[in-house]
Amino acid sequence: SADVHTQKVVVKKFLIPLGLFLGLVIFLAVGLNRDPREIPSPLVGKPAPAFSLNTLDANAPKFGPQDMKGKVWMLNVWATWCVACREEHPVLVAFSKANQLPIVGLSYKEVQPQDEPAGKKFTPEEKLQFARDRSALWLKRHGNPYVLSAVDLDGRVGIDYGVYGVPETYVIDKEGVIRYKRVGVVTPELLQSTILPLVQKLSAS
């Protein structure tokens, strides 16, 4: 009858949007509950984005990933203002002493707006010098696990590397390809269970 047909149409009109809504809710719930550290980076398996940056050493030439060609190495994104980096740093210092794997630092957005004098903006040279001075002092106090640390003042290199926040760590192979990315703190357990076995495998190939 017409009434039954009308009821079916109404039910369909109601159920389809409801189904779509529930599907969206489930999708979002899964996404929100998923640890962002476990989400694979689209960069893994691809060449590390090229860059050329000043380092903390004013007398050293600029650095880029191409300078590490032929070596397996780690790139660690850090900053002195990063609270989680303080938790991670002793782990990296101990690791660098016990292993031959070169760790390159990427000093990320070291100079924050509140660091600049009131009513005055740093020139690019002043900004770089401020970053060098504060970072050098911090590394002297906490230990230096890095063979060198490049300075990403404006965070542009961080954008190319898909940096969510600090710290982040990448393992890069002899051909300059990113093989692993970690968002968040590197722990001793992670080094032993994941990073070291990967490094040994890449070094042997």
Regions found by a protein language model. Name each.
Residues 86-142, 153-159:
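Structural microenvironment flanking redox-active thiols in thiol-disulfide oxidoreductases
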Residues 14, 140-146, 151-202:
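Thiol/disulfide oxidoreductase modules built on the thioredoxin-like
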Residues 3-54, 204-205:
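N-terminal targeting signals for export/organelle localization
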Residues 47, 102, 147-148:
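Conserved beta-strand segments of alpha/beta enzyme cores
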Residues 51-74:
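A short beta-strand-turn-helix
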Residues 51, 81, 109-112:
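Feature marks short, surface-exposed loop/turn motifs that line or immediately flank catalytic pockets
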Residues 71-73, 77-81, 165:
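Short pre-active-site segment immediately N-terminal to redox-active cysteine/selenocysteine motifs
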